[in-house]
């Protein structure tokens, strides 16, 4: 059975009126989840492999996403705890499940306490095994993207989340 996740990403531009329209549109369209991102640029981790990407034999293995450019882009799109709580409630009112991508361990307990039952992990963090262990403890189902992950990292992630309900997604960033 297919699960439909509507990705709002940061397309709301920090505006809850836009986000509210997205939530209700997703619900009216029959989606199962509507998703935002819990991203706080001050928590981002520098990762060398994303500075220039990785190309092997003419094939791009890792996307190019330089740290400083990403930090600057995300800084103006930050949401706060009150907006996260509002989002969960708005989703419940609209009859759709809320979902968020968490990028740091520091937000895991906070988000679980706000009513998210399921969580998504970005492909950049599929190999962040401490993060996987943290979300495994606090959420019912894990959606884990694999698009920017090597096969051996995915195999290790399976070992880390063993016993937990999860779905792997192959989301491609372009």
Enumerate the predicted regions with their spans.
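Catalytic cores and adjacent flexible loops of soluble metabolic enzymes
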Residues: 1-174
């Amino acid at each position: 059975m297919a699960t439909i996740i509507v990705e709002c990403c940061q397309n709301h531009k920090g505006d809850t009126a836009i986000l509210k329209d997205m939530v209700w549109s997703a619900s009216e369209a029959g989606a199962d989840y509507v998703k935002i991102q819990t991203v706080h640029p001050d928590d981002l981790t520098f990762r060398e492999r994303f500075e220039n990407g990785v190309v092997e034999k003419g094939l791009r293995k890792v996307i190019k996403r330089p740290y400083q450019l990403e930090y600057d882009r995300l800084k103006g799109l930050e949401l706060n705890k009150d907006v996260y709580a509002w989002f969960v409630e708005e989703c419940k009112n609209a009859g759709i499940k809320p979902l968020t991508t968490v990028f740091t361990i520091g937000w895991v307990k906070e988000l679980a306490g706000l009513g998210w039952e399921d969580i998504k992990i970005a492909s950049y963090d599929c190999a962040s095994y401490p993060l996987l262990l943290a979300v495994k403890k606090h959420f019912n189902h894990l959606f884990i993207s694999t698009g920017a992950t090597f096969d051996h990292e995915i195999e290790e992630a399976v070992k880390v989340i063993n016993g937990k309900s999860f779905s792997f997604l192959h989301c491609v960033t372009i």
